[in-house]
Amino acid sequence: MPTPLILHDDRLLPADPATRAIARRLYAQTAALPIISPHGHTDPAWFATDAPFANATELLLVPDHYVFRMLYSQGIDLDQLGIPHADGSRAPVDPREAWRVFASQFALLRGTPSALWLNHVFHQVFDLRIRLDAGSADHYYDHITAALQTPAFRPRALFERFNIEVIATTESPLDTLEHHATIRDSGWTGRVLTAYRPDAVVDPEHEQFASALQQFAALTGEDVMQWPGYLCAHRQRRAFFAAAGATSTDHGHPSAATADLSPAEAQRLFDTVVRGQATPAQAELFRAQVLTEMAAMSVDDGLVMQLHPGCFRNHNRQLFERYGRDKGADIPMRTDYVHALKPLLDRFGNDPRFRLIVFTLDETSYSRELAPLAGHYPALLLGPAWWFHDAPEGMWRFREQTLASAGFYNTVGFNDDTRAFLSIPARHDVARRVDSAFLAKLVAEHRLDEDEAMEVAIDLAYRLPKQAYKL
């Protein structure tokens, strides 16, 4: 007999009955609030074309490296799952067969946030009431794939059903933003913004850096092989992104290093970089200098700056060579912020025109570095628990370790940071439940009155992300 799939009404709320009752009341005030998704990686083409999603595998498995990295860790070849190769080709695998492999291994996700999110999607979005396993694989595949061909499951209809008020995608400076233009011109009222992510033309160690610079020059008409022209090209593209609705930039660097070189020093370093002769230390210094230059541009154009540092990207060389980037082989690293951010903060940390939202994969930095920095510098805010830490436990640790020094109001609420479109309501629901549980504990301990906790819960779910990202 199939096992029922049940979402308990009190999931993630405290076990203690009195505290749980408080958490229920807090959650009830936030559960139906509109979703603010100020940072993520959904594909704007979905909303531009409003074409049906192909099938269960292409929508829920292939884009989700949270899921297939776990399967890979247990010996499942990515070809069995239909994951594209670096050159765009794929192994000849039937999507149904790939789904069967996934379903047969779904138990590997027990206790993980991926299981929480996916079970929410299955239950709430697709109205499935039995658990996914080998026996239910075909039922799931047929049910989901059939639903995806109906108007109610088109991207725009789901956007509206999910009560998304605004969502931001993330694009390279080389992107023409044609999909965002199509959305704006279509008459659809859904709000889909972009964000400026210049890593491809900032990181000398990126495998496509040289070709990206050539495209950067062709797109902007600037002499990007000279430091002043390179900076002008960034300003031009940032203005283009802002005109298309962007309110933020995003920077994914190996570290949080910043620098403040003189123009002459920066030009000499840049000359070395564009000749392809930069050492690892020089590449790091170049990224550091560009971050400070991006901050200077944010002071001028008002774009909110996000920094996502501290990840060793593509740790598995064989996997990277075969499948390319973003295939589940990224590993958190220890990250310094106190020394790394000082050159940038010396220039802009007190400037009311500047806003920097910093994330971390190094939880040891929360209470030692990031919360004290955000609790002091007016320009600095803390991004929520990110990536490897957006599990309920990670969200709880984030609150515990940052509250004393940064409070709630030097944080920015929640952002889902996902490619998995259908999981967005689930991710926000988890965050709202965890915050309700955390606040309920403070009320039960008489550290907050319930009316204060209610206001904070609404701020974290809705007001703070709108405010932080200028939405």
From Swiss-Prot:
EC primary class? isomerase
Q: What is this protein called?
A: Uronate isomerase
* Family statement: Belongs to the metallo-dependent hydrolases superfamily. Uronate isomerase family.
Sorted alphabetically, the keyword list is: Isomerase
* Taxonomic superkingdom: Bacteria
EC numbers for this chain: 5.3.1.12
Which pathway features in its UniProt record?
A: Carbohydrate metabolism; pentose and glucuronate interconversion
Organism of origin: Xanthomonas campestris pv. campestris (strain ATCC 33913 / DSM 3586 / NCPPB 528 / LMG 568 / P 25)
The record's NCBIfam families line, in alphabetical order, gives: PRK02925.1 (NF002794)
Q: Where is the signal peptide, in residue numbers?
A: none
- Transcription regulation as a keyword of this entry, yes or no, is no
Q: Which GO terms describe its biological process?
A: D-galacturonate catabolic process; D-glucuronate catabolic process
Reactions listed under catalytic activity: D-glucuronate = D-fructuronate; aldehydo-D-galacturonate = keto-D-tagaturonate
